Structure formats: structure tokens, C-alpha cells
Amino acid sequence: MQIAKVRGTVVSTQKDPSLRGVKLLLLQLVDEEGNLLQKYEVAADNSVGAGFDEWVLISRGSAARQLLGNEQRPVDAAVVAIIDTIHVEDRLIYSKKDQYR
């Protein structure tokens, strides 16, 4: 799994029929220290409802397809959780509550 920040949405009017109704998000990956990386990825969000600027947890591969309920969907990554806090040892790396203060 990987931590990422939602940077936007991806809209496509022409797509594989199995992706109809699936929200696609543009994510910026985050390292273990909470730093934004210069790497982006598109992930499906079929159940979590993540929004702009939220930090999320993504799963890849067959686990992502299982989450979406259709292992035949052409999906490499899926959002599995919206992150509330991240602690590393005794340090708070991220807090959703403090994000907009």
C-alpha cells in the first residue's frame, strides 16, 4: 500500500464499460516522512469518497481489483481509506484535523 494526496479528478467520457460510475482521482504520492513526491498516479475510488487535498491509502494490483468488485476491470490502483492521522514513532506526521488550521 502507498500513502498519497488527492490532487484532482480525472474525467473520461469514453472508457471501458466496466469503469462506468467509477470515480478516478489524480494522486500525488507521499513518502514515509510526509513529504510530497514528484510522482503522480491515477487511482479508482469506488467506495471511499475521497476529496481534494485529502490523504488516502491506495492498494495496487489484484487487491485493488477485488476491492472494486470486479477482477476483470482494467484498474492498477484503488483508494482503500481516507487517512485521519499518521504517527511515526513519537512524531505526528499528518493530521487531517490540523490540515486546514
UniProtKB/Swiss-Prot annotation:
GO biological process: carbon fixation; photosynthesis
Main location: other
Pfam families (UniProt xref): EutN_CcmL
Signal peptide: none
Gene3D superfamilies: EutN/Ccml
Top-level taxonomic group: Bacteria
Outcome after substituting residue 38 to A: No change in oligomerization
CC per GO annotation: carboxysome
InterPro entries, alphabetized: CcmL (IPR046387), EutN_CcmL (IPR004992), EutN_CcmL_sf (IPR036677)
This protein's record includes keyword ATP-binding: no
Keywords on record: Bacterial microcompartment, Carbon dioxide fixation, Carboxysome, Photosynthesis
Gene Ontology terms, MF aspect: structural constituent of carboxysome shell
Protein's cellular compartments: Carboxysome
Cystine pairings recorded for this chain: none
Domain BMV, first and last residues per copy: 1-84
PANTHER family in the cross-refs: BACTERIAL MICROCOMPARTMENT SHELL VERTEX PROTEIN EUTN, ETHANOLAMINE UTILIZATION PROTEIN EUTN
Family, similarity comment: Belongs to the CcmL/EutN family. CcmL subfamily.
Notes on the domains: The tight homopentamer forms a pore with an opening of about 5 Angstroms in diameter which opens into a wider tunnel at the base of the truncated pyramid. The pore is positively charged.
Biological role stated in the UniProt entry: Probably forms vertices in the carboxysome, a polyhedral inclusion where RuBisCO (ribulose bisphosphate carboxylase, rbcL-rbcS) is sequestered. Has been modeled to induce curvature upon insertion into an otherwise flat hexagonal molecular layer of CcmK subunits.
Oligomer and partners: Homopentamer. Interacts with full-length CcmM.
Name used for this protein in its record: Carboxysome shell vertex protein CcmL
